[in-house]
Design a protein with these regions (language model features):
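Catalytic alpha/beta core domains of metabolic enzymes, predominantly
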Residues: 1-53
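Short glycine-/small-residue-rich flexible loop motifs, especially phosphate/cofactor-binding loops
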Residues: 4, 71, 101
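Alpha-helical structural signal in soluble globular domains
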Residues: 10, 33, 73-76, 103-106
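Glycine- and other small-residue-rich loops at beta-strand/loop junctions that grip anionic moieties
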Residues: 19, 59, 89
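Short, flexible active-site loop motifs that bind/organize anionic cofactors or intermediates
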Residues: 32-33, 60, 87
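Shared catalytic-loop signature of beta/alpha-barrel
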Residues: 40-79
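Flexible C-terminal active-site loop/helix
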Residues: 78-109
Length: 109
């Protein structure tokens, strides 16, 4: 998702964005800004997304652990009622949990 803005400015009709399940309004707003040519607005949204992306995709590509971190972020933001994950995936703990919590709070949830 760090490449979302860069991809959109190349010209797209849409995209499949997993992160949109967490922040659909912001992803749509980013797309709208790009379509209108409001690159400053788009950059502002991208900068807002970045700490959340870093907390969720801490170790790179999406994985079971990244999905668990996404669920925790969605739970902490009030978008999910539960953050239950199935084995063998584990919920984030310790510093990983704190990083997600800080990012969610920093985003204003």
């Amino acid at each position: 998702d760090e490449y979302l803005l860069a991809s959109m400015v190349q010209g797209v009709d849409g995209a499949l964005v997993g992160f949109a399940s967490f922040i659909p309004d912001k992803i749509a707003e980013l797309y709208d800004c790009v379509k209108k040519g409001d690159l400053k607005g788009a950059q502002r949204i991208q900068e807002w997304i970045l700490p959340l992306k870093e907390a969720v995709y801490a170790s790179g590509e999406p994985s079971g652990e990244a999905h668990a971190r996404m669920k925790t972020a969605m739970f902490l933001s009030g978008r999910l009622k539960y953050d239950t994950v199935r084995r063998p995936t584990k919920k984030p703990e310790g510093s990983a949990y704190q990083k997600i919590k800080s990012a969610v709070q920093g985003a204003g949830f």
